[in-house]
Amino acid sequence: FRVELLAGLCVSWGLYNMDFDDLIKEAQRRTTSPNGVYSAKIMWSSFQDVLIERLKPRDSSDPSGSSDSSQFPSSSLCLSILKAHFPDPRFLWIRRRNKVAQAISLYRASFSNVFHHRRQRKKNEKDPPPYDFTKIESKLQFIEECESQWQKFFSENRLEPLILYYEDFCESLEDTLLIILKYLGERAAERGIPKITPNLLKMADSTSKEWELRFRKEREGN
């Protein structure tokens, strides 16, 4: 639900002058699986700044009792807005144990504007940005804040998301998919999962590892 990705979808689908609500419906129509499953990846920043703000009815009242329209809606209102557009939502919360490595990846991706690399495409060989402790620390704080906000959203709505760790599905994608299918109640889980070749490649490299060691040493020294 990043704005630039949504704009790209509109162009690729040949859709113009479509409001956000209709775009969501069109995305569901085009990408829902034959057995009725629709999935979307939502980062907290997109959840806050794009999805909820654009889908929130202008005259909606906040169940928390807050009347300040300048404040981000309460967790209960956010959930009710989601349910109005995505009935019976199930939440898969993807986290990362090594948040320093995640912060380094985010810093590098933000600098190059390359957030993923597909197996079928030639790798973008842009030079990495210069090492910057302050900027990596800023990304780390951003990641921790986003995770804190998701935790608040789930806790206040008494939701129990399926928690998945990046490191685990990198180790065994098939095992992770089985866990997801069982969580969703899909019978395909009973038949097992064949070996899968991921479409996306890991972008971390030796530079990422060197930076992590350097960052941890500098952080311990502060």
PLM feature spans:
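Secondary-structure boundary motif
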Residues: 29-33, 84, 152-156, 217-220
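PAPS-dependent sulfotransferase catalytic domain
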Residues: 39-163, 171-190
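PAPS-dependent sulfotransferase catalytic core
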Residues: 1-36, 63-66, 122-137, 168, 196-206, ...
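Acidic-residue sensor for enzyme active/binding pockets
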Residues: 4, 147, 167
